[in-house]
Structures are given as structure tokens and as C-alpha cells.
Amino acid sequence: FKMADRPLISQEMSTGYPNNETGHPTRSYQLIHQNPYTLIGYEAYDWADPVSFLKTQAFITGELAETLRRSNDQASGIMHFALMTWFRQTYDYQNIEPYPTYYALKRALQPVLVSAELWGRNLYAGEKLPTRIYIVNDREDGTDLKPSLLHWEIQDETGKCLASGCEKVPAVKHYARHYIEPNIQLPNTLPANKTKTKLVLKLTENGLPISANEYELLLARKEWNAGQVNNSKKIVLLDKDNTKAVFDFLNIKYQPVSSVKELLDSKLKADLCVISGLTTCNDEEKDLLRAYQSKGGKLLFLNNKETAKTVYPEYITGWIIPTEGDIVIMERNDAPVFNDIDVLELRYFNNNKREIPMACTATLKAHRHKNVTELAGQMKIHAYIDGGKPED
């Protein structure tokens, strides 16, 4: 949408509002709009550590600013909203101090910006980091950027270098941008099975630093994931959507079957029956599954919203297809399924594509009942704006 010779403006280039004292979300944002809940779940409320909201607000604010500068070649400027929410105690000059968002914008608004296009933040050790590195030249003096050198490092939380490399960058004209696709190989060896790291970028021109940036990444060994599976237990898999590729990638042992009847065969002596991608289920199969579960059998439904509703209609009434689906929040962070997983780690998975990677493809609508434990959820941000119903 364009109008010749007329500027376009946007109301509230906003990413949320921490209060000026603790850093928790402002009350109206927290309790009426409920947007903080969609981002960080129960960490949004006053009993939680405000660091979760401050960290998330800094992330989305910085990412939004960098994304616009990487992609919009016709923007003359961006007015981010609102400055007073990026600091603690803005009304007291003796005690004012910046929140994390200030530092995120300080990096994002450098005149010469080195910026990584990262879609996923949770990755496996030894894999190639799928990214484009952009150089945006908005120098205040209007000069072109000469051929430069990009230095990259993967660092652990102590700043120790785990992997590094350099890439040449061609000249970039003023008011232009250029990207490269460097070969960044994530380290094979990590200090722990799951390690918090940073991608650190430094751009130099004629040996002098002109831009720097950093991005948090969560790296894990495949053994960390597979280690949650008890190999002494027998897993039987009915696979209709190639979930076996995931199991094979993680070296999880399983026995494949081709039907519900075969899956539930007592001769297999399964400890866990996994059903993945089964979109239809007849009455006989439904009765078999319910009978198996009622006798103590363990079933895991993956990507089967239709089958789950068919088998348990008294509990599951339908589903919602999320418009985003990149963030899932924990309803029960004390559940064993979340052992060794932090509350902000059910998001920004990696699928090696230039698209928002989904953490969920559907949200089941369930009755509140003593037989139902909701482990995790997903809620659309600003769901009320386009006519959404409160119950949805």
C-alpha cells in the first residue's frame, strides 16, 4: 500500500510496557490485555521474577528494530514506543537506570548495523547455523562502507570462545544493505549437555571496529534430548507424518507398526504407544484405544488433534489453529516432562527455514476436569482485536 509523495506513519511501534519500578508489565497490559501472558505465561504476574518480562521485551523490541532495518529499503526512520518504559525510575534522575530493552535498541540502532537473521534459537551442537548476516549502512556522514571483515564467535556464558571464524564483506553503499550467508558451524563439544551461548558479531573496516552485535542461542547435544528417554522401556510407533525421522535423528529406539490394532497388540509388550499424524479414527479403533488406556496402557498422541477429540470427546471439544504458534507457555512447570527445561525455552525452535518455526500447530480446547491436566498452552496476542471470543 503506497501513496505517491506522501509519508506513511504507524501508531505505536510498540512491544510492551514494563512499569518504572519493578519491571513487571504495567497493570492494564498485564490484567486487561493479557498480552504478557501470551509471551511468558505465568511469569507475567507480580509474584514472578520480572527478569522474564524484561528479557522478552528486550528481545522482541531489538528483533523488530533490526528486522525493519534489514528488510525495509524505503523507510526513512522508525519511532519506537515508548522511551519511558525502557528505564527504571524515569522520574528520579539520581536513580534512573536502563532496562535490557535500552541495550537491545542501542545495538539495533547503530548507524552501521551488523545484524543476524535468525529464525530459530534452539539448536543442536555440530549443526550449521542457518542465518543471513546483514550489513546496513546508514552512516550519518553519508559515506559508503568500504569492503569490511566480519568476525563471528560462539561464546558460552563466561565469554569463552567455543567456535569462531571470519568472512569478507563487499562494499556497501550509503543507505543500502547487503547480506552474506556465512558458514557458521556450531561447536561439536559443549561444556554441558545443554548450554546457553551467544553468537557474537564484530564488523571492522580497515581494521577498525564499526559495528558489533550479539544473540543468545541455546545449544544442546542430541544426547541431552535422547537421555530423557529410558532405553529399557519399549516404544511402539504408529507413524503417519514421518515422526520416525525425528526419532532416528535423536537415536531413540522404537518398533514401527502400521495400524492401531497392531500398535495395541499385547504381544508387543509396549511401555509406550506413540500415535503420530493419525487424522482419522473409526469407532473400533477408538474403543480399542480407550480400553487400552483404561487398563493402564500409556498413549502419546502427536499431531493428532482429530483423533484425540474422537477418542476423548468428553474432554476435548475442538481445537484452534494458531496464527503464530511460535511461543508455547508452561501451565505446569513442575511437571516431569519439563525437567531441565526453563520456562522461556518452549519457543523459537529451529527448522532450518526462513520462516517462523512453530512450537505448536494446534491448541486443543478441553474441559476443565480432574482427569485432565493441562501441561502447556498457547494464546494469540491481542486476540480480542479481530473479534475473537473470550472462551477462545
Residue ranges and their predicted role:
Residues 374-391:
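Short, Gly/Ser/Thr-enriched beta-strand-loop segments that form substrate-interacting elements
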Residues 2-164:
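Substrate-binding clefts and catalytic carboxylate motifs of secreted carbohydrate-active enzymes
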Residues 1, 263-283, 298-300:
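Short, well-ordered secondary-structure micro-motifs within conserved domains or adaptor modules
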Residues 196, 208-272, 303-306, 314-327, ...:
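Aromatic-Pro/Gly-enriched surface loop or interdomain linker
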Residues 4-7, 71-78, 232-233, 268-271, ...:
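Loop/turn elements at helix/coil->beta-strand transitions in domains of secreted/extracellular proteins
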Residues 128-171, 177-183, 187, 193-205, ...:
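Beta-strand-rich binding/interaction modules
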Residues 279-364:
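A glycine-rich, often tryptophan-bearing local segment used as a flexible ligand/cofactor-contacting loop or short
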Residues 103, 107, 114-124, 165-173, ...:
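Extracellular/periplasmic ectodomains of large secreted or surface enzymes and adhesion receptors
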